[in-house]
Design a protein with these regions (language model features):
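N-terminal processing/targeting junctions
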Residues: 59-62, 93
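Basic, amphipathic "hinge/linker" alpha-helix immediately C-terminal to the N-terminal HTH DNA-binding motif
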Residues: 73-96
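N-terminal helix-turn-helix DNA-binding core of bacterial DNA-binding proteins
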Residues: 2-52, 62-65, 73, 80
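Short beta-strand "wing" residues that participate in macromolecule-binding interfaces
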Residues: 68
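Amphipathic alpha-helical dimerization/coiled-coil segments
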Residues: 1-12, 19-23, 88-110
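Short, hydrophobic-biased segments on the C-terminal half of alpha helices
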Residues: 54-58
Length: 110
């Protein structure tokens, strides 16, 4: 596979999650305070079910690319889950997107 293509981010749903979090500024960054996105907002922007988004976030979290924080409410239905792209996830996304651009540029040159 092409150098820089990240097998964790490659599936379209995970790529979408990472790019939405990055575009919204929901990233851990040493230059500013962490910013997070509500699970429900992310779900609505990407168009996945709760279960599908939870599964994909689990894979990304296992690899250290996203962080989830649960804010407990008085009932489980009132819990809030916040999601952010980690610094490691941000670097992986940047490398992945650069590799995709390189592929696109190579194809364009042919």
């Amino acid at each position: 596979m092409t150098a820089g293509i990240d097998p964790v981010i490659r599936p379209i749903d995970r790529l979408s999650i990472c790019t939405v979090l990055d575009s919204a500024g929901a990233t851990e960054d040493e230059r500013r305070a962490d910013t997070e996105m509500k699970f429900g907002v992310l779900r609505d922007l990407i168009g996945l079910s709760d279960a599908a988004l939870t599964k994909q976030l689990g894979v990304l979290e296992t690899h250290g690319y996203v962080r989830r924080v649960r804010e407990y409410g008085s009932t489980r239905a009132k819990d809030k889950v916040w999601v952010s792209l980690t610094a490691s996830g941000h670097r992986a996304l940047r490398a992945h997107l650069a590799a995709l651009r390189q592929i696109a540029d190579t194809v364009h040159e042919i």
